[in-house]
Amino acid sequence: MKIETKIAKFTKPLYLESGRILEPWQIIYETYGELNEKKDNVILITHALSGSHHAAGMYEGDRKPGWWDGLIGDGKAIDTTKYFVISTNVIGSCFGSTSPMSPIHPGSSERYRLKFPVVTIKDMVKAQKILLDSLGIRHLKAIVGGSMGGMQALRFAVDFPGFCENIIPIATTYQTKPYVIAINKSMIEAIRADSEFKNGNYDPDIIKQNGLKGLAAARMIGYLNYISPKTFERKFGREYVKTDGMFELFGRFQVESYLEYNGAMFPKWFDPLSYIYILKAISLFDISRGFVSLEDAFSQIKDKLHLISFSGDTLFFPEEMRDIKNYMDKVGGKCNYFEINSDYGHDSFLVELEKFDFIISDILKGEV
């Protein structure tokens, strides 16, 4: 599989939903496979909260492959012998696209930090569309994304009707609910409460080296909602860390050790400000904003919508995706709904690929 990483730089302003602008700005992306002569074999991959453009394959020195490697590649569900796959890093993220830690002016040593404008899912999608236009791509075979990536897929369908043959949102919602907004708020405040966050004026190199307890705590909060109680039970039970005494005040169960380790590792590769800004974008997501009603928003969709949810998702509940199906039926849209039986939790879209990869394969073959 041919893999390339590129950065597209733009000097024309990116006008944001808030009324503010980014100028100049850039977006980093990864491609897999070969673009055909007609440029009609393109699939766009959109990532979740802490994801990146590196969705598949491995580079020299990588510890593990891209986050959807089991789905993308030669002979896989998203077959790179047939399709040219583009995976972008969203505006606001910390892997190479314009973000809070980007220079506030070209050549400046001053970074945006908290002066960075609030970005929305709509802004992320607008940036992706500008990228595709710059590549001469006028139509997509499919857009596939899970969680926040599914929000981007839905937003694309509403904002650019007819641009894509198949829209495949996975484990997502049409409107972030108060429960998730509350979770996101808890994570944001955990970061802000850490004195080493310094109101966004931290040294990123020091954070990568020493970590940030507030971001680690935020990540632990997140894990409680990405993995189901049954999965925690299966993986850890009530086992205690062998080196810890059971009656030590800070002695740990295995599950506590797991949360501590993953929380501590997270700041070494993900930026605290990017985490805050992307959480805010997720909280703000509402597909009906700018429209008279939800029905009005969904009536804009002219493409085939294929919804994939998981029965045990406790972040974006399957009922929310069933609501999308109901709205699409009301407005006479083309929509399929698949509910996967799983008790793993929200992160099923990352770890249980074998339960839905064949659905994506069939969609791309035109068999659904």
Curated annotation (Swiss-Prot):
Residues forming the catalytic site: 147, 313, 346
Presence of keyword Cytoplasm: yes
Principal subcellular localisation of the protein: cytoplasm
Pathway: Amino-acid biosynthesis; L-methionine biosynthesis via de novo pathway; O-acetyl-L-homoserine from L-homoserine: step 1/1
GO molecular function: homoserine O-acetyltransferase activity
Residues annotated as domain AB hydrolase-1: 41-352
Binding residue positions for substrate: 219, 347
Keyword GTP-binding: no
InterPro entries found in the cross-reference section: AB_hydrolase_1 (IPR000073), AB_hydrolase_fold (IPR029058), HAT_MetX-like (IPR008220)
Gene3D superfamilies on file: 1.10.1740.110, alpha/beta hydrolase
Keyword line: Acyltransferase, Amino-acid biosynthesis, Cytoplasm, Methionine biosynthesis, Transferase
Domain of life: Bacteria
Compartments, record wording: Cytoplasm
EC number(s) stated in the UniProt entry for this protein: 2.3.1.31
GO biological process, any: homoserine metabolic process
A Pfam family: Abhydrolase_1
Protein purpose: Transfers an acetyl group from acetyl-CoA to L-homoserine, forming acetyl-L-homoserine.
PANTHER family: HOMOSERINE O-ACETYLTRANSFERASE (PTHR32268:SF11)
Family: Belongs to the AB hydrolase superfamily. MetX family.
Subunit structure: Homodimer.
NCBIfam families attached to this UniProt entry: homoserO_Ac_trn, PRK00175.1
Protein name: Homoserine O-acetyltransferase
Originating organism: Nautilia profundicola (strain ATCC BAA-1463 / DSM 18972 / AmH)
